[in-house]
From Swiss-Prot:
It comes from Rhodopseudomonas palustris (strain BisA53). This is sn-glycerol-3-phosphate import ATP-binding protein UgpC. It comes from the Bacteria. It catalyses: sn-glycerol 3-phosphate(out) + ATP + H2O = sn-glycerol 3-phosphate(in) + ADP + phosphate + H(+). Residues 4-235 form the ABC transporter domain. ATP binds at G37, P38, S39, G40, C41, G42, K43, S44. Keywords: ATP-binding, Cell inner membrane, Cell membrane, Membrane, Nucleotide-binding, Sugar transport, Translocase, Transport. Pfam families: ABC_tran. Its main location: membrane. NCBIfam families: PRK11650.1 (NF008653). The complex is composed of two ATP-binding proteins (UgpC), two transmembrane proteins (UgpA and UgpE) and a solute-binding protein (UgpB). Transmembrane segments: none annotated. It is an enzyme of class 7 (translocase). Part of the ABC transporter complex UgpBAEC involved in sn-glycerol-3-phosphate (G3P) import. Responsible for energy coupling to the transport system.
């Protein structure tokens, strides 16, 4: 096991494009760290820099107390699991897992012991003589993880390993990866664009956007106290509702919040009112119901603000302007076109500065 520390790490490509813009964070010994963000945020580039597959323009990467900037990937004592499995199609499962150890000159009895132990842990012992084409997607991913395990690395690196699997298998493999990492107690850095995957796997969440880190913390910390409007809207499904306060009637309802420019409310923190009165210190919002999604035990109600107030989104085009989402119990079913009032208490309100870059507590 080993800790991983990044100090002011930067990556600039020829032509001047800066993909990574001075990133600092540390992953503790045995910790499961997830890098999450939208496509193009730099998370995979950063992982490849840790692996040694991308050069570093500036800064330092430290693995286990050793700066590895100029050290070859094979000598960094890491193992990487890729999105496309990267298995040799002409080799058996056994030989795929043993190949790297043979190249390192390890003795046959030691190779055999490591391969069979990894196969036992991953429950793929009956598959050792099969070729990759004879395996399902989930089985191939287990083989790819087995190839990483036999190296007994200090750090596991995962580059969106579940993105090629169907939804049901993704959930099953997500659980398997977390159980495996805890069992081996090995430091892991995992890249994904799926915020649900990130929330369920991580000890530490690193939310990235545009080559910078927006927030670092445990999944619950990031969900409950997002540092910026980007984090508020990216972490959570459905995303947080964000509303401009400048010149808005909502500002008059707020107790405190001086300097706030944006109000955020999670969909589950809004409740339908029957008498139209907001809780003390909270807010009440009038909506016209535009759509209702029924998903069994709960429903998602989509509405537009009746008073014309503006909703904002750090991801233009992803949500209609002015849309508010409310999560309600499944048995509640407002009629389309109906006008309703929803409310949230003061302790469930999130306030941000006008630019959305700073949380105001």
């Amino acid at each position: 096991m080993a800790s991983v520390t990044l100090r002011n790490v930067r990556k600039t490509y020829p032509g001047g494009f800066e993909a990574i813009k001075g990133i600092d964070f540390a992953v503790g010994d045995g910790q499961f760290c997830v890098l999450v963000g939208p496509s193009g945020c730099g998370k995979s580039t950063l992982l490849r820099m840790v692996a040694g597959l991308e050069t570093i323009t500036a800064g330092e990467i430290d693995i286990g107390g050793r700066v590895v900037n100029t050290i070859e990937p094979a000598d960094r004592d890491i193992a990487m699991v890729f999105q496309n499995y990267a298995l040799y199609p002409h080799m058996s499962v056994y030989n795929n897992m043993a190949y790297g150890l043979r190249n390192r000159g390890m003795k046959k009895p030691d190779i055999d012991a490591r391969v069979r132990e990894a196969a036992r842990i991953l429950e793929i012992e009956p598959l050792l003589q099969r070729k990759p084409k004879q395996l399902s997607g989930g089985q191939r991913q287990r083989v790819a993880m087995g190839r990483a395990i036999v190296r007994q690395p200090k750090v596991f690196l995962f580059d969106e390993p579940l993105s090629n699997l169907d939804a049901k298998l993704r959930i099953a493999m997500r659980v398997e990866i977390r159980k495996l990492q805890r069992r081996l107690a090995t430091t892991a850095i995992y890249v994904t664009h799926d915020q649900l995957e990130a929330m369920t796997l991580a000890d530490q969440l690193v939310v990235m956007n545009g080559g910078v880190v927006e927030q670092i913390g445990s999944p619950l910390e990031v969900y409950r106290k997002p540092a910026t409007t980007f984090v508020a809207s990216f972490i959570g499904a459905p995303p947080m509702n964000l509303m401009q306060l400048d010149g808005d009637a909502l500002r008059g309802q707020l107790a405190g919040g001086a300097g706030a420019g944006v109000l955020g409310i999670r969909p589950e923190d809004l409740t339908l009112l029957t008498d139209g009165s907001a809780p003390e210190g909270g807010v009440a919002i009038e909506l016209r119901i535009e759509a209702v999604e029924r998903v069994g035990p709960e429903s998602f109600v989509y509405g537009s603000r009746s008073n014309g107030g503006a909703a904002v989104s750090p991801h233009p085009g992803e949500r209609p302007a002015g849309e508010i989402i409310v999560r309600v119990p499944g048995e509640i079913a407002p009629e389309l076109g109906a006008r309703v009032t929803v409310a949230a208490p003061r302790q469930k309100l999130h306030l941000f500065d006008a630019g959305g870059r700073r949380r105001i507590d």
